[in-house]
Amino acid sequence: MEEKIFDISKLADSTYFADNRLPAHSDHHYYANEEEMLNEEMSMRQSLNGLWYFSYAKNLASRIEGFEKADYNCKIWDTIRVPAHIQMEGYGKPQYTNVAYPWDGHEELNEGEIPTENNPIASYVKYFTVPQGWNEVFVSFQGVDSAMALWLNGKFVGYSEDSCTPSEFDLTPYLVEGENKLAVQVYRFSSASWLEDQDFWRFSGIYRDVYLYTKPQVHVDDLFIHATPCNDYKDGKLSIDFKWNNENAKKLAVKLVDNEENVVIDTVQEITGATSVFTADVENVKLWSAEYPNLYKATFTVKDENDNVVEIIPQNIGFREFKMDGNIMKINGKRIVFKGVNRHEFDCYYGRAIPESKIAHDLDIMKLNNINAIRTSHYPNNSKLYELCDIYGFYVIDETNMETHGSWQIRGSVRCDKNTVPNDHPHWHEAVLDRAKSMLERDKNHASIIIWSCGNESYGGKNIYDMSEYFRKADPSRLVHYESICWDRVNEASGKMVLAMPDERRYDGTSDMESQMYTKVAQIKGFLSKYREKPFICCEYTHSMGNSNGGMHKYTDLTDEEPLYQGGFIWDFADQAIWTRDLYGNDVMNYGGDFGDRPCDYNFSGNGIVFADHAPTSKLQEVKFNYQNFTLVPSETGVKIINKSLFTNTSNYDLIIALAKNGKNVWQKKLTADINAGQTGEVAYTLPTFGAGEYVVTASLVLKQATIWANCGHEVAFGQYVFTKEGKADKKAVAPIKVVKSDFNIGVKGEGFSVMFSADRKMLTSYKYNGVELIEEFPKMNFWRAPIDNDNGCGMPFDTAQWKLASMYTKCVDMQVSENGNESATVKYTYELATRPVAHVVVTYTVTGDGVVKVDMDYKKVEGLPAIPDFGMLFTLPVDYDQIKYYGLGPCDNYIDRKEGGKLGIFTTTTQDEIQPYLVPQECGNHCDVRWFEVTDRRGRGVRISSATPFEASALPYNPHELENARHHYDLARPHHTVVRASAGMYGVGGDDSWGAPTLDEYITKNEDKHFSFEFKGI
């Protein structure tokens, strides 16, 4: 065999993407016998995970040449773990960038070219001996970022690109007796890097499993399962295409067992030839869906011509149909709604080299929060994800490893020229198709995958259209998705997207559905009022950067109102930040720029509904509610249940009716509801009678039985109803007060308390209760919040900056004191605010003999001022007052546009737990619809704030300005006080996007007349 030499210059050749790489195939496992299969131990596979010898170089010029030679001693090198990113193992720097390519600003490159100054090279070496009895030896690299060259015993074996699908090679011709030397060189940047410009941390290295494997004499190289329902979804048809490694005679024993261990098929097929097809009918088939992920267990036992078992293949099979019915996508005949999330393969400790246990943990979180769909943004994931999605029940959009927005999205404008990748450029055509083939061939047998995606934000053009056509031809059972089809309807003259009719678009057929990202609800409605030839999904929406996801219910409500709108995928699942320890040994989450990486996009990777360690954020409370499959509308006499599931009867759950009086549970009953999927029904009940008070009826559906992702009793849906029973208020005797008027202060004293107002400083300066001073600093009016990421993205802090100054700087222009005998005393301050035009706020304190201080804040609208981020007051208490108890919406924080998932009740928490560890400190901890709010020390001493009208409140260890000044949580000092905030209401958090979309107008606290009344009292 003629020896090949690797030509390093081909790294910059976009037509060179695979050399001697084996064809892609299905990801099935195979075992030598039944015992192996039961123990999941493959004797025909040998893992190469573990320590490899390793050498790092900054660029091609400084790499070690000749290291692959058999006599080059690499055993004196350092070692590195595999699988892992080299940057997570201390070699080079992690870099986070969104659109810009990593070399932008360092080297000026045309498309396909690679950097010369900074192109980290990772050289790996592993020594091994061939297991006894292995005649053929192959090696599989499940994921290498971004390109790799392979040698065995000094001989060049092959080359491969595509960081996210397997690269496999035949090592047999290069083997020697005894010890063999496997050498791999991994290049961070190759021409393929132009196709892999995803919005994520830029790593390199061998980051997925590596293993050797052999094949038996007779072997299934590939199988393609087609399992579809028929006869009006009552029965099933099974057809399986087999590709064999030779044409020898063989036998195939097929056994199919359902999820109750009933044998459905048990037969033997005699085969000759390199291909074969197995077909069978299945009566009374149990269909697969996200609601009922019914899987049949197949075992394919392969025997040679002498009837010896040579391999056994286990395979899960799900019967399901996903198709376009007219202009509606349907699963098993029912209109599907995607309650989805985008999932980057990322963990703060491992990067994209995620252990399998972490994958299962992610799916648990999703199921617990009613998520039914995953988009693998923007590359094929570890095969384990799809295996588990089949079992858990998720609808998956499997996305090709391609994103090129750095080649054409330039500072907010669109560029279409020779550097736009891939567009119609013929030299990218085969590389683009190769990525599609590698994904489809590996993943095709997973029932959970219902859509193939052509990548993300890679412009339009013929190359991507041809990819979509490949998907359709190779697998007609699935639909094809591509969001950037919009760039195939660009008006060439203006350079702007126009919503042209289909016959005016270049490649309208690329995507089977209209897919857009971050489109506002009103825009979706407008689009669908004109263009109804395809269903509409949001492949990315409700951008979850920091404190976000406001207004999400507008989108989920639209799925009920507009049949063509079939849901969306939240951006995204987990914050992307990297864990380290600081100089003091504290845990730190680092984002872009923290490693000295430039260019970078700083904290723009913090878009998760879970944090970087995959702990839940408070945003999940809203996601769970908006994604629930059942709408429960309770009343005083019964509950209406709208069953929005596709296949599930409510009788699968217990219906729990609970009654609370003034926040305390007083009654509960378990019922059963029998309402079919897609139907609406009512369940009656009779509530017990209690006295006057505010009542909350909570209706919940909870699991009757435990699942793999939740315990029995887990709540899947709830609804609440609030009503009030009036009664005669008890007249309480008013204790007398004493007013002390001095030269500089006004004192008000009563039984067990005292209040002091400064005539000099013009503010409330003291409130003592039971001899304890509760006010550490003067109460301050507050019109500001620590800007959230969405605020910064839309420029809200700049637009409303006057209100920050108004919160910090005021001037009292009038003070009035009045008494109502010995029953109450009133002190009224009029403050001029640091705004232009000048605004005034009147703060009135009324003290009564029971120790209550009533506060009234009044503002008269001043024309010319912007909207007001918040309207309330801050109280600073000692730091040991860190225990919170409140009657309002909880348990997680909520905002006027993100409170659908909050429950009205009494909750307890702490000031530290109310801090949400977003990558950048920002506003958090707010609670809406509060009746009363208590902050105490551990002995129960403190203050209660209440109001006759529901208000908003929070208690944190920091004030808004301290939060705003910090870029990381370690910038915040150890807490020295507790800041309690009472508010008439603040801005909603927004979330349509995080780079320009403001909070929806209805959730903005506008510049208008305002009145806020509340009272506080020591406890």
Language model features with spans:
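Extended acidic/polar, glycine-enriched regions
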Residues: 176-179, 243-323, 691-732
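Beta-strand/loop-rich accessory regions of lumenal/periplasmic or secreted enzymes
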Residues: 88, 95-97, 188, 289, ...
